[in-house]
Curated annotation (Swiss-Prot):
Origin species: Synechococcus sp. (strain ATCC 27144 / PCC 6301 / SAUG 1402/1)
Recorded family membership: Belongs to the ATPase alpha/beta chains family.
Membrane topology (UniProt): Peripheral membrane protein
Oligomer status and interactors: F-type ATPases have 2 components, CF(1) - the catalytic core - and CF(0) - the membrane proton channel. CF(1) has five subunits: alpha(3), beta(3), gamma(1), delta(1), epsilon(1). CF(0) has four main subunits: a(1), b(1), b'(1) and c(9-12).
UniProt name for this protein: ATP synthase subunit alpha
Residues holding ATP: 170-177
GO MF annotation terms: ADP binding; ATP binding; proton-transporting ATP synthase activity, rotational mechanism
Superkingdom, natural source: Bacteria
Amino acid sequence: MVSIRPDEISSIIRQQIEQYSQDVKVENVGTVLQVGDGIARIYGLQQVMSGELVEFEDGTTGIALNLEEDNVGAVLMGEGRNIQEGSTVKATGKIAQIPVGDALVGRVVSPLGAPLDGKGEIAATENRLIESPAPGIIARRSVHEPMQTGITAIDAMIPIGRGQRELIIGDRQTGKTAIAIDTILNQKGEDVICVYVAIGQKASSVANIIEVLRERGALDYTVVVAANASEPATLQYLAPYAGAAIAEYFMYKGKATLVIYDDLTKQAQAYRQMSLLLRRPPGREAYPGDVFYLHSRLLERAAKLSDALGGGSMTALPVIETQAGDVSAYIPTNVISITDGQIFLSSDLFNSGLRPAINVGISVSRVGSAAQTKAIKKIAGTLKLELAQFDELAAFAQFASDLDKATQNQLARGQRLRELLKQPQFSPLILAEQVAVVYAGVKGLIDEIPVNQVTAFVSELRSYLKTSKPEFIEKVQSSKQLDDAAEALLKEAIAEVKKNILAAV
């Protein structure tokens, strides 16, 4: 028989008491009252913050948006098919974040940073809040460096600077995305990190864009954030903020970044859907009252930082789709008032064969002229005016039968300028080529060339400069100026190419 000694028992109990550590865990828990249409109403969650992430029993994450007296309205970031009435919900104590780092470059991610390209996990170095405050006035510098798009019509007449917000607006199928993609392609070798945010687009369209970027080597400096049409409205609403957070990571490291939001109309529609389901009062066009703030807080994050903060920049190119050219609708007017200018694409011009279909009359850049390179500023001053006058005269000439010689000359010049600015997709021009093309048109050096030969003249001139006058390209590209020596070289090249074109006609 084993004898039990009381002192042994007491020492064991004492030992266990010493080892016991009281770990009190307080959790903020609620109960699902109702779920459906991507919205959950939750009872409890007394301590929840606005915008805080909440976790449901089945692992689905949501964001608490409506904090009411007796319940919390949360939007789901997944299907949420297994969430049941009466199941528990936990508050996480975190606001939505995205993992960021250099490893994101070249990848396709969801608005929450999950990889979508099948290339494995992303080794992120830190997390950034998806919504973060915009830089203040002291933290900024005025826009003074050019962001070349490679599209002659834009760089000559509607120049964009680093840190600017320039809206691309137009009807569907007018080439809005094409301009954005061309701008990304033109950043090759410029040490600019590009972020392309696809909101509510077809997965096939996004796949095509990624393929174009990969083929032309642009994916090496681009991050794609995709919230496709099949994704919940919550992810489509978050996608632009996630793109801005990724760009901010690089901007605060002193890099130049370019963000394209394609397009913010779909984000506004996703937000309207969420707001109506949350029973928020509808306003104009059934959008909620804070839809202006939705876009302003996003676009204000674009900035050119002061030298004290590293001098990085974030240039934003938001895209807005209009209905039948109506720029006075609610969302277009909101975004026009927030941005520093707009590039308006017209379906009439597009259908008439002018690509890119930029309506020069109502397109404007409010701050970009300060950033325009001297070479193109020197020669493109009159270009916008001449094209605007040509549009007026062309409308008038339809009714007038006999026109005086000066008017005929002006119409002829305008037609040739129009042809000069035509540019095929995915073929951005370098600065020296743009200078050459605009110079030839503005100085009247192609007035004798037939209109149908102008496109041939442009391609001939580009190849001639590359092969026979490389010193002109070198001079303009390095100094960003058109001095007398470079101008003399350019005149020779234009005369030579013109002679060849006229001889062949």
